Amino acid sequence: MSSSQSPAVELAAIREMLRLYCHALTERSVDLQDLKQLIDKNIGWSKNEVATSDGRAIFLPAIVERFDAHSDNFDFLKVMLTQQAGHIEFGSFAFEFDRPAAKFDDLRPKLAEPPDYHDHDHGHEGHHEHANVTELTRFFKLFPNKRLALDIFSIVESGRIEARIMHEYRGIAKTYDAMRRRTVKLRPAMTLLPAREALLESMVRLSLGQKHGVKVPSKHGKIAREIRTMVRLIAEPDATVEDAAEATLRIYARLAKIKNDYLNETEFEELDHRSKRSNRSNKFFGRT
């Protein structure tokens, strides 16, 4: 197949167009760079993500060839860029440890020790390489299992941003949602994962908008429903990055005590998508 017929999309060829698109979304000048720069330096939000940002630049793969059609690969690249622009636009990099959440009662002040970080402390693998890195460093020091806390926070905050994108960026919402549905189909089967990872996977799927077929370990059904309530709170338009932090504290407290053992497929149940968040759950998790 010749290059003219290839379904692959190359970042270099459309970088300037994407930069202008990003500027139109955020009204900010954002540099677009090759993701390989982060991979080579072993930094970024997650080592297996296909795109990331440090709050100033957005890092995208040099070539996208996930799908058979060029248009699908272009849409995928555009959706990745939109999500990272959303992280910049909607405050992922503006986290403040002491700032109150909008949807949750604040647990951070009750758990925090006096900060002992320094300006040279780069916290989590260089994803936030500016002043606010120390704020997240202070937050993640609350957790004995920082890897689990980071996984939870990444899922919750990405879910918040995606919900906000769907609400604010109406022009791309249809394409964005279609790509999310395709992404769900590529996710691992929940029944093949150990218990704790299955619950994390349920969070990913809920944040991607999946309503049917979300399976969770039956013996942890109550925890799964509580997590779903928090995921829904985070998806509300006025939720902030501080809400993502508060949700992380609550979800971590539930998942940390679950043994990450494999279960039989018969030990899973489907979450009832028709369940609504009650006033009681709102009082339990957040503000009335």
Where are the regions a protein language model picked out?
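Extended non-catalytic scaffold regions that mediate assembly and binding
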Residues: F268-S275
